[in-house]
Amino acid sequence: MPVVFVAASKLPTPFATFTMHGFLDEATGREHVVLSLGDIADGEPVLGRLHSECLTGDALFSQRCDCGSQLEAALQAIAREGRGVLLYLRQEGRGIGLLNKIRAYELQDGGADTVEANERLGFAADQRDYAICLPMLEHLGVKSLRLMTNNPRKVKALTDMNIKVAERVPLHTGHNPHNRYYLATKADKLGHMLGNEHQGEVPQA
């Protein structure tokens, strides 16, 4: 996987001063970022998150998803721990891109759920490729994670790459009336582990 390290710098945030590592995927031209804090190459499991880019949630305060809230909660958790890593992956819209995500939102406004909308546009429900994470984690010396996620697919992807997931740390945050059925669909159709709150809430056709 031709993902190469480019540069690193300090990144002060309201939570902590992280080190920001920049990587380039030469195959796609996409630029990815890793935020790290503390000694993450000591062989001990590292509190971490794989966070896919979500412009609407991360930067524009959208309540259609829980992404922005999860990003903030993950960075806060790493800051409290004093040690951790967050991979910010440029895989907008579960891998379909920003404009296609807006097209999917338009279909959702008409009644489709998040999975149906992607499929009507000719995409899989989730097109993300987590193989890009391996060279970044190897560069940083991370071999084991306490992974902050509700998505079992991320756990499997890391395990398949021989990155040990020592623990899955749930991230239950950002729930609101606007994303209730979105979260229910992720639980019912994508297998996300969101507890009982959203199980069985997808409206039946």
Curated annotation (Swiss-Prot):
Please name the Gene3D superfamilies in this protein's record: GTP cyclohydrolase II (3.40.50.10990)
Signal peptide limits: none
The biological pathway it contributes to is: Cofactor biosynthesis; riboflavin biosynthesis; 5-amino-6-(D-ribitylamino)uracil from GTP: step 1/4
Record EC number:
3.5.4.25
Q: Which GO terms describe its molecular function?
A: GTP binding; GTP cyclohydrolase II activity; zinc ion binding
- Listed binding positions for Zn(2+) are 54, 65, 67
**Cofactor(s) listed in the protein's UniProt record:** Zn(2+)
Q: Extract the coiled-coil ranges from the record.
A: none
Family matches, as PANTHER family: 3,4-DIHYDROXY-2-BUTANONE 4-PHOSPHATE SYNTHASE, GTP CYCLOHYDROLASE II-RELATED
Q: What is this protein called?
A: GTP cyclohydrolase-2
Higher taxonomy: Bacteria, Pseudomonadati, Pseudomonadota, Gammaproteobacteria, Pseudomonadales
The coding gene here is ribA
